[in-house]
Amino acid sequence: MTLFVEAIEWIFAPERASGALPLREAISTHLLYTLIAVAIAAAVAVPAGYLIGHTGRGRGFAVALAGAARALPSFGLVLGLVLIIGVMYKVEASITAFVLLAIPAILAGAYSGIEAIERHVIDGARAVGMSPWQLLVKVEAPLGLPLLVGGLRSATLQVVATVTLMGYVGNWGLGFHIVQGIQLRSFDQILGAALVIVVLAVALDAALAIVQRLVVPAGVQRRSGTTRRRRRPAERLSAT
């Protein structure tokens, strides 16, 4: 309990506003690299996921690729890319690693969102004369958006935690304070920086959870509400 109090005091100490890397700057850098990595991963994974979900081709390869990518050790991937690309490009190498780690969750969310759409909805859209492009843009993409945002949530949580590793390859992000705390055996600094990362991750997840709820089409919300109301009388009868 004493260590927790000391960690809170470390976070709000006046010294956090100055020094080698002020806490506010560390948070901004941590958040910036997270958003950059997720945005690049989304630019790659969303079109690929929509193509797989729309055509049904390449799903097995995508599942295998996503599974293999999730098994990659984050720390080894970051350090390996830094050594391969070069120490002069530490930021670029680190962001590349974060992008590779974020792609599987976004890819899965993109194609599973389209696959989850009921078949009669797709058949109805084709019956009214929609082209494949119109079907994707007007039907599949909007209905699959909640699962896509769910994939973005998973990717964001993974990346915001993994960006901490940048503290081992450079003086960036909140990982810098953790690495510095390990070197100085300053446990309040380690815990304080970790708590800030947790708060940042929870805030991002909560924001994306709200977005995920808002992107559910109104018709789907009404239908799910009607389904729940229909089930309740049946549940009462089964209970009696």
Residue ranges and their predicted role:
Residues 109-148, 174, 178:
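Short cytoplasmic-facing helical segments at TM-TM junctions of multi-pass membrane proteins
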Residues 43-48, 92-96, 100-122, 145, ...:
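Membrane-embedded alpha-helices of multi-pass transport/permease systems
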Residues 1-2, 10, 21, 206-240:
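Transmembrane alpha-helical segments of polytopic membrane transport and secretion proteins
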Residues 48-81, 98, 108-112, 123:
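Cytoplasmic-entry segments and transmembrane alpha-helices of multi-pass inner-membrane transporters
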Residues 22-33, 82-105, 144-145, 189, ...:
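Loop-to-helix entry region at the N-terminal start of transmembrane alpha-helices
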Residues 1-38:
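Periplasmic/extracellular loop-to-transmembrane helix junction in inner-membrane transport proteins
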Residues 35, 133-165, 192, 197:
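Transmembrane alpha-helices
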Residues 174-211:
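Hydrophobic alpha-helical transmembrane segments of polytopic membrane proteins
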